[in-house]
């Protein structure tokens, strides 16, 4: 392996900007409707399907090329945490959590994973709508215990483990960024991809029907297709930079060894 590539701090940022530039090039060349169909079909588009192997590869890679140091117990716990988050990301990508919740309480949750309007209500009497993965769903007395337990488990397994990992590595990450550690910069690009996904997901609703983001008579606008492409591609980039950080860390720790 070329040390000038894998061991340089700027490897991940260069790759991040190259991927975003390629995405904008694809957006500029494709019709908005065709781009949306290629990137987003509720887990069944070609791009969404292509994203799954990247997340799936995280699990075997983190055990095969363990990126962590320390005792065997520490390495096992950290590898297990990474595996759990990767598996939960696959669950989210395939919308399996929505399917499971619909199966648990079909009277409250529709097949699309959204709350059925007019069934559950807020304390002020207004209908409870949107995703069931929020506090108001958990505190509603009409929701079955099994559904509440599933939502709590989902948050604990995904966001809980992920948040614990962020807190555990927060200080080493900040130090690594300022010391130009390549793994820290790969993790930073991982986080930047996550921010990209969240911004692209919420941007249309933030801007509402202004700035050309409303649906036109012809269908999807160019701005809407860009947001869709950024969101879906950002999810693939999350997996790519997770894989890069894992391999970089393993390689740097074992450089010079016969591995």
What label would you give each PLM region?
Residues 1-19:
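N-terminal membrane topogenic signal
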Residues 16-34, 198-201:
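Alpha-helical transmembrane segments of multi-pass membrane proteins
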Residues 41-49, 111-153, 220-233:
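Short aromatic-rich membrane-water interface segments that cap or initiate transmembrane helices
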Residues 89-107:
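Transmembrane alpha-helix/helix-exit interface in multi-pass inner-membrane proteins
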Residues 194-259:
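C-terminal transmembrane-bundle signature of multipass membrane proteins
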């Amino acid at each position: 392996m070329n040390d000038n590539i894998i061991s340089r701090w700027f490897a991940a940022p260069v790759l991040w900007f190259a991927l975003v530039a390629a995405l904008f090039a694809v957006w500029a060349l494709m019709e908005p409707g065709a781009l949306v169909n290629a990137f987003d079909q509720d887990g069944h588009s070609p791009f969404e399907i292509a994203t799954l192997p990247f997340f799936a590869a995280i699990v075997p890679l983190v055990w095969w090329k363990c990126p962590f140091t320390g005792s065997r117990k520490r390495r096992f716990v950290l590898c297990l945490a990474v595996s759990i988050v990767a598996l939960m990301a696959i669950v989210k990508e395939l919308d399996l959590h929505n399917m499971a919740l619909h199966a648990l309480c079909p009277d409250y949750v529709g097949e699309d994973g959204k709350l059925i309007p007019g069934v559950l209500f807020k304390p002020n009497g207004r209908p409870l709508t949107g995703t069931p993965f929020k506090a108001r769903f958990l505190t509603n007395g009409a929701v079955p215990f099994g559904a509440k337990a599933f939502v709590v488990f989902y948050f604990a397994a995904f966001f809980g483990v992920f948040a614990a990992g962020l807190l555990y590595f927060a200080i080493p990450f900040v130090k690594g960024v300022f010391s130009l550690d390549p793994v820290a910069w790969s993790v930073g690009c991982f986080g930047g991809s996550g921010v990209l996904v969240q911004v692209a997901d919420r941007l249309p609703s933030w801007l509402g029907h202004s700035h050309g983001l409303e649906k036109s008579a012809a269908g999807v606008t160019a701005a809407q297709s860009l947001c869709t492409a950024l969101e879906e591609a950002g999810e693939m980039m999350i997996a790519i930079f997770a894989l890069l950080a894992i391999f970089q860390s393993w390689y740097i720790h074992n450089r010079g060894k016969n591995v």
